Each structure stands twice: as structure tokens, then as C-alpha cells.
Amino acid sequence: MIENLLPAIQASWPENDAGQTIYIQQDNAKPHILPNDSEFVVAVERTGLDIRLIQQPANSPDLNGLDLGFFNSLQSLTDCLSPRMLQDLIKGVLDESENYEVYKLNRVLLSLQACMVEILNHAGANGYKIPHANKERLENLGMLPPRLTCPPEVYANALHNLGIMERVAC
């Protein structure tokens, strides 16, 4: 995370969003680091960005980009290999992930971002339909955005729902 993710965020973060808090959400698996990990905190300070590490809420698969399509896509690619041993399967997954096309991963990340907006729109509840944006068609037209932004009114409403609107300067 420190060697790859933070530099990637720093290099690609839009200038017009400077000063905005960036939240990195990870699931609760044991290999992940804690939000107050000292090495992570120092590395974030070096970026000059406001980056915070948070844990994925329990039972929220829509917030797991891997569950939104990446694993299924890798599985369908590796199923074609018919591995006979565990080592063959691991090698196949590693090969496929290294050769995984960026545009496919972008589609997964856009779905994740759209789910995040919907969760904010529904005051944190999960009673929404996963939005479909015709990503393939937009991609073919050269109109697929590299990222989604949260509409200001959705963000403000989410802050209001959390009862912290008064503490945030707009």
C-alpha cells in the first residue's frame, strides 16, 4: 500500500480536488494494516495529501471492488486453463492478473464508485439497486470517465445525515 497505492494516488489525484480528504477503504482481513499504522501515517504525511485509512463495514459486498467483478473475471479466465495442481492455479491467477486489461478494471472501479454514491444517497442503507451506466457503450464512444465524482448535494446530504454538517465549512 505504501509503495504502490500512495504514489499512484498522489500522481493521479485531480488538482481541482486538492485539499479534499481521500479515504482508502480496506476489508477487515488480517493481512491489512490498521488505520493508525505508524509507517502508513508517515508515508501519508510525505504525500502532502489528506489520506485516511478506514475499514469496510461488515456485510457490505457492494463496497468490495473485488466482489463487483474482478474475481469473477479472473475466475472465468483461469477456468480456461484447467489447472491440475494448486501451483498451476496460482500461476494462472498471477499470469491473468498481470495481463488483466486496465479498461476492465476501470469498469469495476466505476461500479464501486457508483455504489458508494448510492449508499450515500440512501443514508448508508443498502436498499438500492446497483447502478448500471452502460460502461461498455460509453467506452466505445470514448466517453467513459476515468472516475466518478460524488455530486455536492449528495455529499452535503450525507454529512447532514451524519449530523456533522455544522462542523464542515462548505
For each feature predicted by the language model, list its residue ranges:
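Distinct, well-ordered alpha-helical segments
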Residues: 37-38
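RNase H-like polynucleotidyl transferase catalytic core
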Residues: 25-28, 43-65
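Short, basic/hydrophobic alpha-helical segments
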Residues: 1-23
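A structural preference for long, well-packed, hydrophobic secondary-structure segments
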Residues: 9-13, 54-60, 73-80
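C-terminal anion-handling pockets and recognition modules
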Residues: 66-170
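C-terminal catalytic core of Y-nucleophile DNA break-rejoin enzymes
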Residues: 29-34
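Alpha-helical hydrophobic/aromatic positions enriched in membrane-embedded helices and signal peptides
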Residues: 19-20, 56, 116
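Mobile genetic element proteins and their domesticated derivatives, centered on retroelements
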Residues: 1, 24-27, 41, 64, ...
